[in-house]
UniProtKB/Swiss-Prot annotation:
Gene coding for it: nac
Keywords: Protein transport, RNA-binding, Transport
GO molecular function: RNA binding
CDD domains attached to this UniProt entry: UBA_AeNAC
Self-association state and partner proteins as the record states: Homodimer. Interacts with the ribosome. Binds ribosomal RNA.
GO biological process: protein transport
Similarity annotation: Belongs to the NAC-alpha family.
Protein name: Nascent polypeptide-associated complex protein
Disulfide bonds: none
Pfam family, one: UBA_HYPK
Matching InterPro entries: NAC-like_UBA, NAC_A/B_dom_sf, NAC_arc, Nas_poly-pep-assoc_cplx_dom, UBA-like_sf
Length: 111
């Protein structure tokens, strides 16, 4: 590819309706079972045929496995501790899905 001078590049970007987003800290791509986190990326927005195309480049990449808590686990914690649905779910999330830890945490504060 031939090198382009900055003026030509700027003109081409304007013709293609391209612009770069500044100050982007991270981009998170959420999948069903995990998240891909791209830190300090370069993000370019291209408008083509009425659609916006986001091009993400570079940065550090990190994957996080998404915690999946089953309804059965939430119900079990509710039955064992007498708490409501949201409290049981939150306790399981804080315990990374560990049933025993969630139940102990909720019952430790009880008389």
């Amino acid at each position: 590819m031939m090198p382009m001078n900055p003026k030509q590049l700027k003109k081409l970007m304007k013709q293609l309706d391209m612009r770069q987003l500044d100050n982007v800290v991270e981009v998170i791509i959420r999948l069903e079972d995990r998240e891909i986190i791209i830190k300090n990326p370069t993000v370019t927005v291209i408008k083509a045929m009425g659609e916006k195309i986001y091009q993400i480049a570079g940065g550090e990449e990190e994957e996080k496995v998404k915690l999946v808590i089953s309804e059965e686990d939430i119900k079990l914690v509710m039955e064992q501790t007498g708490v409501d649905y949201e409290t049981a779910k939150k306790a399981l999330e804080e315990a990374n899905g560990d049933l025993a830890e969630a139940i102990l945490k909720l019952t430790e504060g009880s008389p």
